[in-house]
A protein has these predicted regions:
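Histidine-acidic residue clusters that define the catalytic metal-binding segment
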Residues: 273-282
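Small-residue-rich helix-loop
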Residues: 220-268, 273
């Protein structure tokens, strides 16, 4: 009799344990199989956020707080999540999402700056970039140049036009610093491999020339030839007479047309008036234009004129150039 009673008690206890264990397993699996609710989107994990609260916020399905706590004890590697902005996928396992938060692999935004853009264009892009801290608005050009280590206080031309990735912890100045460092490194390396006897005294003068080449080039395969024209003119002491410098010099007065008064306007960038190079670059040159400035094609051309489609007709003499102007610009025989 006593044995039967003991057996009954033990059997009941075992059944209770089995049921309880099954229930715990069921609740564990509920958490284990949770998926992200909502569409694929960016999600910001705030500093100090707790994994259990994120499970409740993001999980698609029913859970119990105690089951979530138990599940997290079984997955301690998912507890130490890192703040930041992440891309979470629609329907992805929540376990995978928490693993992403724990890894700290934030979503990377990107900014692409095009060759030939000006510093003012960069500032506009930076000001409209999402999740980027704005610090440049508080600084003058001179102050910003000083912070970046640019000696002459002028920023035009000093940033390499490329695609730059960043996360939500980045600032606009951090993007500019990387672009400046990339430009300086490429310019210095290219300067060391330059042709002999070029009419530049410093890498900065080559950067100025590269910016002019960038603005004049419509067909990439003409860069080195365009560079040769300007190098030849510098060697002969001729004025560069290039329209993009005129446009840069007249600033906001430019409305799409270059007037005769613009060509005679006395300013440091009017290469129809000044000798040699302007004082600063007129845009951000790309790598190809820097290479062309430092390794121009060997020609005896002194002039070129646009002939359509971004291409140019190159001339050796003024008479030949004037004939080309009549043919391609004035449309006269």
């Amino acid at each position: 009799m006593k044995f039967n009673r003991l057996y009954t008690l033990l059997a009941g206890a075992a059944l209770t344990v089995a049921v309880a264990g099954g229930y715990v397993y069921y609740k564990w699996q509920q958490v284990e199989t949770l998926t992200n609710k909502g569409p694929t989107r960016l999600f910001t994990v705030e500093k100090g956020a707790h994994a259990a609260r994120l499970i409740a916020e993001l999980g698609e399905g029913e859970t119990s707080p105690w089951a979530v706590r138990l599940w997290l004890r079984g997955h301690p590697e998912l507890v130490a999540i890192k703040s930041g902005t992440y891309e979470i996928k629609e329907g992805a396992p929540l376990k995978e999402t928490l693993s992403l938060f724990a890894s700290g692999k934030e979503f990377h935004f990107s900014l692409t700056f095009v060759e030939g853009s000006r510093f003012e264009d960069w500032l506009k892009q930076l000001s409209s970039a999402p999740y980027l801290e704005r610090l440049t608005v508080e600084q003058s050009e001179t102050e910003l140049a000083q912070e970046l280590g640019i000696d002459n206080g002028k920023l035009e031309g000093w940033f390499l036009p490329e695609t730059y990735a960043y996360t939500t912890h980045a600032s606009d100045i951090s993007i500019l610093r990387r672009a400046y460092q990339d430009m300086k490194a490429f310019l210095d390396a290219s300067w060391e491999k330059r042709q002999a006897n070029l009419p530049y005294k410093t890498p900065y003068e080559a950067l100025i020339m590269a910016s002019i080449i960038e603005k004049e080039t419509g067909q990439p395969d003409e860069r080195a030839q365009i560079a040769s024209v300007f190098v030849n003119r510098l060697r002969l002491g001729m004025k560069l007479q290039t329209d993009p410098t005129v446009i840069y010099g007249v600033k906001d007065r430019y409305d799409g047309n270059i007037r005769r008064s613009d060509l005679t306007d006395v300013n440091p960038y009017n290469t129809y008036v000044i000798d040699g190079l302007p004082p600063t670059p007129i845009a951000m040159p790309g790598k190809a234009s820097i290479e062309a400035a430092l390794n121009p094609k060997s020609t005896d051309y002194l002039y070129f004129v646009a002939k359509g489609g971004g291409a140019h007709y190159f001339s050796r003499t003024l008479d030949e150039h004037n004939r080309a102007v009549r043919e391609f610009i004035l449309k006269k025989p």
